């Protein structure tokens, strides 16, 4: 029974390919190609993960990246309604990411990679700006760092030892 529940949860996850890179190595017989893939997995309800993998075949790199993403799932519980509770600015290596809450009806105003991450996280209204590096891996890490750093109003009041209504 438990196994079927877990497999049902896995079935709800949607997998998207963010980036595919092809590298070549010059050898005696010619060029040897290898591939790397950055994969995003999410259910649109706050569960999200990413994986990076390399392989000699593109399909193997995508499959391995998907497996890695499923192993690295996180849950974002601090989403309030369709947006985030507060503004956040995060640095990750050379990339900076600014996330701002938005009113209902705004939609996701962000670049393509960050937009995909936020859609798969289940955020509906947000404004995001990517600053600094446009390295895909650093942008993804910055987005995950930003989403994990969010705290709900209730959490903040509890930390400040203020009674909340």
Swiss-Prot record:
Chain ranges of the S5 DRBM domain: 13-76
Record's GO cellular component terms: small ribosomal subunit
GO biological process: translation
Highest taxon above the source species: Bacteria
Annotated Pfam families: Ribosomal_S5, Ribosomal_S5_C
RNA-binding listed as a keyword: yes
Keyword line: Ribonucleoprotein, Ribosomal protein, RNA-binding, rRNA-binding
Alphabetical list of SUPFAM superfamilies matching this protein: dsRNA-binding domain-like, Ribosomal protein S5 domain 2-like
Gene Ontology terms for molecular function: rRNA binding; structural constituent of ribosome
UniProt-listed HAMAP family: Ribosomal_uS5_B
Domain description: The N-terminal domain interacts with the head of the 30S subunit; the C-terminal domain interacts with the body and contacts protein S4. The interaction surface between S4 and S5 is involved in control of translational fidelity.
Subunit annotation: Part of the 30S ribosomal subunit. Contacts proteins S4 and S8.
Protein function: With S4 and S12 plays an important role in translational accuracy.
Family indicated by similarity: Belongs to the universal ribosomal protein uS5 family.
PANTHER family: MITOCHONDRIAL RIBOSOMAL PROTEIN S5
The protein, known as: Small ribosomal subunit protein uS5
Organism annotation: Chlamydia abortus (strain DSM 27085 / S26/3)
């Amino acid at each position: 029974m438990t196994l079927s529940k877990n497999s049902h949860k896995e079935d709800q996850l949607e997998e998207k390919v963010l980036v595919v890179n092809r590298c070549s190595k010059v050898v005696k017989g010619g060029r040897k190609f290898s591939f790397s893939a950055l994969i995003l997995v999410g259910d649109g309800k706050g569960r999200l993960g990413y994986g990076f993998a390399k392989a000699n075949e593109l399909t193997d790199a995508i499959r391995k990246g998907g497996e890695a993403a499923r192993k690295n799932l996180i849950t974002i519980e601090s989403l309030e309604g369709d947006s985030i509770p507060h503004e956040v600015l995060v640095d990750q290596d050379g990339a900076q990411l600014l996330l701002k809450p938005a009113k209902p009806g705004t939609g996701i105003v962000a670049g393509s990679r960050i937009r995909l991450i936020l859609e798969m996280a289940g955020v509906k209204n947000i404004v995001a700006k990517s600053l600094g590096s446009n390295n895909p891996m650093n942008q993804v890490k910055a987005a995950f760092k930003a989403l994990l750093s969010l705290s709900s109003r209730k959490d903040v009041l509890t930390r400040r030892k203020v009674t909340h209504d």
